[in-house]
Amino acid sequence: MKVALIHSRDDVAGCTIRRHIEQCLDDAHGSANGRTYEFVEVGGRLINAEGVDATLDVNLVIFLSRHSSVNPVPVLTVHATGNFGAAELGGSPRTLAPAAPAMMQATLRALARYCPEGYRVSYEVTHHGPTGLSHPSFFVEIGSTEKEWVDPVAGRAVAEAVLGADPAGAVPLIGIGGTHYAPRETAIALSSRGAFGHIASSRLQVALLDRELVQAMVVQSRAVAAYIDRKAVLPGDVSRISAILDELGIPRLSETEITSLGHLAWEAYREVRALAATVGPQTRCFIHALEGTGPLVLVSLDPVLLSEAKRCDESALVQRFGPLPVAHLATEDNVLLPQFVAFERNSSKIINDLNTLCVKIIRNRESTATENDYLVIRKVRFDPQKARELGVPAGPAYRQLAAGQAVEYDGQIITPDRVSVATETRIHIPGLENYS
């Protein structure tokens, strides 16, 4: 890969970063991570560098720049370029440049590794030019005052991050919502395969998004999905933008869905989502140890078995899905469903593994018996009607009896067994006698 590193001679932070990159490249004999680099120096502000890459024979452009803020804090940032509205800071109105989500994420993660003490690392939303670019590009910046712009420690950190960025398994996304420093998108990119290209902020940019701009975000980011920070975006805007994404055929992923992608290839994940949609239009899917290729199928558990296991310990149940090569499904409100997705070749074993998991959780919490292929769950619960028939008034005595404690009322000892009712649930599980 050939990379152009562009800075302005009038930008002290850009000069600082270039100097440290040159030092690092001297140590690495001119290349790093299989990439070769070409330095390009321009005059004036980089935000006005329209067409600067038109004659460059490269695959990627990285702008080395300073970052300024009305509330200055030491920060290292990356972001794509473009304008959702007026071109107040270079470029053209309502125009987005080609982004480089995978390299942006890799650089962000490398910045986090090398970040000096006292600095923080984040994306920024798309907010300035240049827009007239031919190659995928992004800015990497040191902020936010001259003290940081000339800081050799920050300059070295950015240099090592640019050269050490190593994209792997990135899933390119667009981000909608949040503040200027895109906190949720930053957290997602640092903890998952989610790699953002263009990002729009809640306060100034989301209201500007129409079909044309959303489509431009997707195309210029080469995004396969979108993330909406629902806590930061007004409900009306969420609905409006969601409708646009539906028209464009772009899926929306929640933060949990992105962080649970695991190592599954994106096309396989799309197939998982397609199977989930046959269960219900808003069904969510959560990937566990599912990876590889092959035909995917839905497998189903007995809904009563799953319900009983959930009631016993839902947290442990979901946690123990982790090592299994499955995706579990849930409603939009995160209610666990009895359908799972697995590779067809594993489906019989997966059903047995899931049955075994549920049975173990139930046996750990309930009184059970095995009768041939039936799991029998016996429960004894407090019956308020029986207590009333014995004259026990509602109140503390009810709570004691429900807790399995005898009470004295009107000269008689009333034991829990006198005010209890026994129930029995029978669940047919083929091969149960062989389960451990």
UniProtKB/Swiss-Prot annotation:
EC assignment: 3.1.1.96
Annotated cofactor note: Binds 2 Zn(2+) ions per subunit.
GO BP term, pick one: D-amino acid catabolic process
Gene3D superfamilies linked to this entry: AF0625-like
First-level EC class: hydrolase
Protein name: D-aminoacyl-tRNA deacylase
InterPro entries found in the cross-reference section: Deacylase_DtdA_archaea (IPR018033), DtdA (IPR007508)
Protein task: D-aminoacyl-tRNA deacylase with broad substrate specificity. By recycling D-aminoacyl-tRNA to D-amino acids and free tRNA molecules, this enzyme counteracts the toxicity associated with the formation of D-aminoacyl-tRNA entities in vivo.
Domain of life from the UniProt record: Archaea
